């Protein structure tokens, strides 16, 4: 073989190898592009306690592995802590609101509960069970509970406090509903990916309290949809961080900011008006017009109230071409969320698959 033919042979091998490598790179780039298309990022936003974390739990139940017995057991301590936190809040409010206990022994029970360091609670001992049950049955405490908009109390307080006997049993294992009702403030960012119809939905939950919001900024890239939660029942409540600011006004201000962000010009917006069950209960004795004087609908009418609240939020949208998709929800009701998210999923897929030419 001549030198020239040897060089030509080597060169052709190099060219072949170079082509093979290029083909591999092209293939990987196509794969990466396809995978990026297959992942949709859903950003879950809303003020503190609007129901975002509960919504994520529902996604795990409906579209993920759910909660095993071992997972549920991991919530036991948190259920106990939620009960103590709730009763401590009520006991403190009894003093602040100057409400008297009907039963004399409840002064001692209140003192016993106040002295508990909630973060160290891991069990539910007999003396505390009795103290909490006796306190909860006191007409003074019930009067205080009826005035709960005047202090900070978790929405799940009544759910747990009326079921102390079940929770106090030996070998107690939290139910799925117990898990959904547990309140643990979200600090930092929680991501929950789940696979639906060969597309990964990556749901991102960020803390709703003001102090948490500065951590949101890096979540804003490549967001497919904004899912914004509003607690319908917060129309008469004040912020945890500021006791002279209305929670719903804060929610409106945040929503206005979010929908006008340049980052989100190409993201669809889905508005969940959550806690519709709590609104139905509250509207019977707390009048919307007292907090939003522009409301001119009938009193004690949950339908009129929620339609008014929906309009308040939709009217914040300055872009007439941008559709805001809205749903009334109860995040603790698995069947309601299953139904609503099926509709939401279809909306998101239709909007995005067109964009990616996948339909």
UniProtKB/Swiss-Prot annotation:
Residues 41-54 are annotated as: G1 motif. SMART domains: G_alpha (SM00275). Residues 201-210 are annotated as: G3 motif. It holds the Pfam family G-alpha. InterPro entries: Gprotein_alpha_Q, Gprotein_alpha_su, GproteinA_insert, P-loop_NTPase. Mg(2+) binds at residues 53, 186. It catalyses: GTP + H2O = GDP + phosphate + H(+). Residues 329-334 are annotated as: G5 motif. Gene3D superfamilies: GI Alpha 1, domain 2-like (1.10.400.10), P-loop containing nucleotide triphosphate hydrolases (3.40.50.300). The keyword Magnesium applies. Its main location: membrane. The keyword Nucleotide-binding applies. CDD domains: G-alpha (cd00066). Guanine nucleotide-binding proteins (G proteins) function as transducers downstream of G protein-coupled receptors (GPCRs) in numerous signaling cascades. The alpha chain contains the guanine nucleotide binding site and alternates between an active, GTP-bound state and an inactive, GDP-bound state. Signaling by an activated GPCR promotes GDP release and GTP binding. The alpha subunit has a low GTPase activity that converts bound GTP to GDP, thereby terminating the signal. Both GDP release and GTP hydrolysis are modulated by numerous regulatory proteins. G proteins are composed of 3 units; alpha, beta and gamma. The alpha chain contains the guanine nucleotide binding site. Interacts with RGS22. Interacts with NTSR1. This is Guanine nucleotide-binding protein subunit alpha-11.
């Amino acid at each position: 073989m001549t030198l020239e033919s040897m060089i030509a042979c080597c060169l052709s091998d190099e060219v072949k190898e170079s082509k093979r490598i290029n083909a591999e790179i092209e293939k990987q780039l196509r794969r990466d592009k396809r995978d990026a298309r297959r992942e949709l990022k859903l950003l879950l936003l809303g003020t503190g306690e609007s129901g975002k974390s509960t919504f994520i739990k529902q996604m795990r139940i409906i579209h993920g592995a759910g909660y095993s017995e071992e997972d549920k057991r991991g919530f036991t301590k948190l259920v106990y802590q939620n009960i103590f936190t709730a009763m401590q809040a009520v006991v403190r409010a009894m003093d602040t609101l100057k409400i008297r206990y009907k039963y004399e022994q409840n002064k001692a029970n209140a003192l016993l509960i106040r002295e508990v360091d909630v973060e160290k609670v891991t069990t539910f001992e007999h003396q505390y069970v009795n103290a909490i049950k006796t306190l909860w049955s006191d007409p003074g405490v019930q009067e205080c509970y009826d005035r709960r908009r005047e202090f900070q109390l978790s929405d799940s307080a009544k759910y747990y406090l009326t079921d102390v006997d079940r929770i106090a049993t030996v070998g107690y294992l939290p139910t799925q509903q117990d898990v959904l009702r547990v309140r643990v403030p979200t600090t930092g960012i929680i991501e929950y990916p789940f696979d639906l119809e060969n597309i990964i939905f990556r749901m991102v939950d960020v803390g709703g309290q003001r102090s948490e919001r500065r951590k949101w900024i890096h979540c804003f890239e490549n967001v497919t949809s904004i899912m914004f939660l509003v607690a319908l029942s917060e129309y008469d409540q004040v912020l945890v961080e500021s006791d002279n600011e209305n929670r719903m006004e804060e929610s409106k201000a945040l929503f206005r900011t979010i929908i006008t962000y340049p980052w989100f010009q190409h993201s669809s917006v889905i508005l969940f008006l959550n806690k519709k069950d709590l609104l139905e209960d509250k509207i019977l004795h707390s009048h919307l017009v007292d907090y939003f004087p522009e409301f001119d609908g009938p009193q004690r009418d949950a339908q009129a109230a929620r339609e008014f609240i929906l309009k308040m939020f939709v009217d914040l949208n300055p872009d007439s071409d941008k559709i805001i998709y809205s749903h009334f929800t109860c995040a603790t009701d698995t069947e309601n969320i299953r139904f609503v998210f099926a509709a939401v999923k279809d909306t998101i897929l239709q909007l995005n698959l067109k964009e990616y030419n996948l339909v």
